[in-house]
Amino acid sequence: MANYFNTLSLREKLDQLGVCEFMDRSEFSDGVAALKGKKIVIVGCGAQGLNQGLNLRDSGLDVSYTLRKEAIDSKRQSFLNASENGFKVGTYEELIPTADLVINLTPDKQHTAVVSAVMPLMKKGSTLSYSHGFNIVEEGMQIRKDITVIMVAPKSPGSEVREEYKRGFGVPTLIAVHPENDPEGKGWDYAKAYCVGTGGDRAGVLKSSFVAEVKSDLMGEQTILCGLLQTGSILCFDKMVEKGIDKGYASKLIQYGWEVITESLKHGGISGMMDRLSNPAKIKAFQVSEELKDIMRPLFRKHQDDIISGEFSRIMMEDWANGDKNLLTWRAATGETAFEKTPAGDVKIAEQEYYDNGLLMVAMVRAGVELAFETMTESGIIDESAYYESLHETPLIANTIARKKLFEMNRVISDTAEYGCYLFDHACKPLLANFMKTVDTDIIGKNFNAGKDNGVDNQMLIAVNEVLRSHPIEIVGAELREAMTEMKAIVS
């Protein structure tokens, strides 16, 4: 199979990268009607599969699960997830032939095998859905021309898809229709109905394309969402220990600090996060983050270039074919890092202390979010897509580190995200080696404000605030967060 994106002309590539429209809630006024009475069969019952299925069923839709015969016979976790929640479970041969909508929610590396197995069983005129377009865009999977192909991609882990739905809300979602597979022109109707069924219409929906979703998703997860959080965790911990900070304190500051710091990012963007610092600390964090952006920009651009060209997918799929040799080696090595092996200390850290003693972490978040956004938009990805794949998802990933450190983050994210995370981390740590030699405990481990009078140059502070607040990610972020807030108010 040929990489689909690379078969397109330059103009077609730019057109598909640029598909991005924030949809008005009125566009979802038909609710789930387009799928009412239709048989929905979900392939796979992991976190996304189970939680999306629960939401769809609670929205009045007919949902069942199909698994490989061996998974059913051996009662694997996927079988238990579905059966213990009262869903009908059957083999491909039993359920696929009568399905109107088949939703593929298996791991990325299984998509080619799964789709190749189910497609011959799918009835004429049925619909196939993905929550990530890697199989279509990067692997170039060819779907039978009578089959409609859609994508509904919630921008959060599966557990949050369910929890937000139970609260009467949802999570921001991207929807798309593959232009090569919309024979009856009903793809958008099905995608919108599916999105309503998961609750996504209540939190903000972007009309996207398979290409835009894949190229932006890969970039975000490799750089700021996973890669830089892993690099930052290891470097900050090692620096604190080197400078004599208690290991338990250092471990706790990092493990829970990302979550605390990015919570303000979620509500107020980069400006809201930086506003949690004192004026002198804000100026220092700004200066540090500017230096980090200059150092890391070539690496971010290389990752984006390799994603756009298909080089990243090529080397990752080679590792798939080699039994994940590199992935498993890198995963094991991460588990042996000092940060990962050091338990969080039994010490109380107040919320503000995470900011005051973690200035370098704040600077890394600002640098990483802005760089990811800038690099994506330079490549033709629209601001809204770039926002969701950078700033919006950072708090969600930070939450996984708070639970069980980097192991949990890498367990929860997709296989493509984990592979890209390790590639970035291995390149970024040596890139930052000279910078880290200049770092002391005033910006990581101890309070930057200690012994200072809190005075700053007014013009410098004004200039810093202006740069922060005028960045394009702040402008589009404010609009998208306001839309989400308005919808949440309507729902509640």
Curated annotation (Swiss-Prot):
Transmembrane segments: none
Organism of origin: Cytophaga hutchinsonii (strain ATCC 33406 / DSM 1761 / CIP 103989 / NBRC 15051 / NCIMB 9469 / D465)
Lineage: Bacteria, Pseudomonadati, Bacteroidota, Cytophagia, Cytophagales
Molecular function GO labels: ketol-acid reductoisomerase activity; magnesium ion binding
Keyword set includes Transmembrane helix: no
GO biological process terms on file: isoleucine biosynthetic process; L-valine biosynthetic process
Protein name stated in the entry: Ketol-acid reductoisomerase (NADP(+))
Keyword tRNA-binding applies: no
Pathway per the UniProt entry: Amino-acid biosynthesis; L-isoleucine biosynthesis; L-isoleucine from 2-oxobutanoate: step 2/4; Amino-acid biosynthesis; L-valine biosynthesis; L-valine from pyruvate: step 2/4
Record-annotated KARI C-terminal knotted domain positions: 209-353, 354-487
UniProt record similarity statement: Belongs to the ketol-acid reductoisomerase family.
Binding site for NADP(+): C45, G46, A47, Q48, R68, R76, S78, D108, K109, Q110, G158
Superkingdom of the organism of origin: Bacteria
UniProt-listed PANTHER family: KETOL-ACID REDUCTOISOMERASE, MITOCHONDRIAL
Purpose of the protein: Involved in the biosynthesis of branched-chain amino acids (BCAA). Catalyzes an alkyl-migration followed by a ketol-acid reduction of (S)-2-acetolactate (S2AL) to yield (R)-2,3-dihydroxy-isovalerate. In the isomerase reaction, S2AL is rearranged via a Mg-dependent methyl migration to produce 3-hydroxy-3-methyl-2-ketobutyrate (HMKB). In the reductase reaction, this 2-ketoacid undergoes a metal-dependent reduction by NADPH to yield (R)-2,3-dihydroxy-isovalerate.
Entry annotation: catalytic residues: H132
Note accompanying the cofactor annotation: Binds 2 magnesium ions per subunit.
